[in-house]
Amino acid sequence: MIINIVEILIFLVCVLFSVAYLTVAERKTLAYMQRRLGPNFVGYYGLLQAFADAVKLLLKEIVLPKESNYIILVISPLITLITALIGWVVIPLGPGITLGELNLGILFSLAIGSLGVFGSLLSGWSSNSKYSLLGSIRSTAQLISYELILTSIFIIIIMFVSSLNITTIIETQRVVWYCIPLLPLLLIFFIASVAETARPPFDLTESESELVAGYFTEYSGSPFVFFFLAEYSNIILISAFNGYLLLGGYLSFNYSYLFNILFNDYSYVSFLFEGLINSSAYAIKLVFLMFSFIWVRAAFPRFTYDNLINFCWIILLPLLFGIFLIIPSTLYIFDSFPTLI
């Protein structure tokens, strides 16, 4: 029991540190793309800027609107943050290295991810602000729409694997990553990920020119920090899912021939060598996917809300349904259905 609690605390600290340095990386990358310096005073090369910002926000006064529902207004950011952190339970960092090895890991992640919408919806309603309410309505419609896209992609991948266990999905990609036969899904998954996390150019829930700051307009101090942590935690989490489902997760390309050259048998040295390669492959994929979020923010203008919703229901969803029909037909023709189906 004590060991499990320690593991959870270590995992949470690692996630929160990753969130902190993702914000620094985003600001430095955007500054480089826009030919300016960015944060460079707090710590070496600005590496401690995230902690300075966190202290500043935590020390600010929590101001609540007079006519708001105080209890729900304070609880809503916690709902968003907790659902973002619980999603990490089923994420494997390596073979057998996970907080909770669930046979229904995909279903669990979808269920927990869909609960995050309640935080934004309740925060907008309880703020007693028209800007916040409109932002929460936009957020709800956007998250529900693109949640359907992500669910469809999960179902297509489950057709290949015949399992809802994330580790099993990763291990079936030892021969070839699914992004190679399912290349269009990689692009669709990334687009849906950007929309699901409400990141630019799909940040219509908090468009400054229309809604001030969306559903967290009335937040300040620590409740605002919770929304901030939840947003960037979701970016890392959904990037991890993208890497696990389509990019082989912690697997690199087939390197078994290196073992035959370097080691005569499967010794502890070869085991450590494999762990080093797997962890490096996982880190490279995750950094690449998170950098893609930052690059899209700098490169593309914001969509209008009607274009965002129409893009989901008129373009992406019919395209996925077409893929949904093609893949089972192809598997049936070549008699390649998974044996468990």
Swiss-Prot record:
Q: Which GO terms describe its molecular function?
A: NADH dehydrogenase (ubiquinone) activity
Q: Supply the enzyme class, top level.
A: translocase
From the UniProt record, list the reaction(s) this protein catalyses: a ubiquinone + NADH + 5 H(+)(in) = a ubiquinol + NAD(+) + 4 H(+)(out)
A GO biological-process term: aerobic respiration
- Provide this UniProt record's keywords sorted from A to Z: Electron transport, Membrane, Mitochondrion, Mitochondrion inner membrane, NAD, Respiratory chain, Translocase, Transmembrane, Transmembrane helix, Transport, Ubiquinone
Transmembrane stretches, by residue range? 2-22, 39-59, 71-91, 104-124, 141-161, 175-195, 212-230, 243-263, 276-296, 308-328
Compartments it resides in? Mitochondrion inner membrane
Q: How does it sit in the membrane?
A: Multi-pass membrane protein
Q: Which GO terms describe its cellular component?
A: mitochondrial inner membrane; respiratory chain complex I
Instruction: State the EC number(s).
Output: 7.1.1.2
Primary location: mitochondrion
Function, as annotated: Core subunit of the mitochondrial membrane respiratory chain NADH dehydrogenase (Complex I) that is believed to belong to the minimal assembly required for catalysis. Complex I functions in the transfer of electrons from NADH to the respiratory chain. The immediate electron acceptor for the enzyme is believed to be ubiquinone.
Entry similarity comment: Belongs to the complex I subunit 1 family.
Its assembly, as annotated, is:
Complex I is composed of 37 different subunits.
Protein name stated in the entry: NADH-ubiquinone oxidoreductase chain 1
Q: Which organism is this protein's natural source?
A: Yarrowia lipolytica (strain CLIB 122 / E 150)
Gene encoding it? ND1
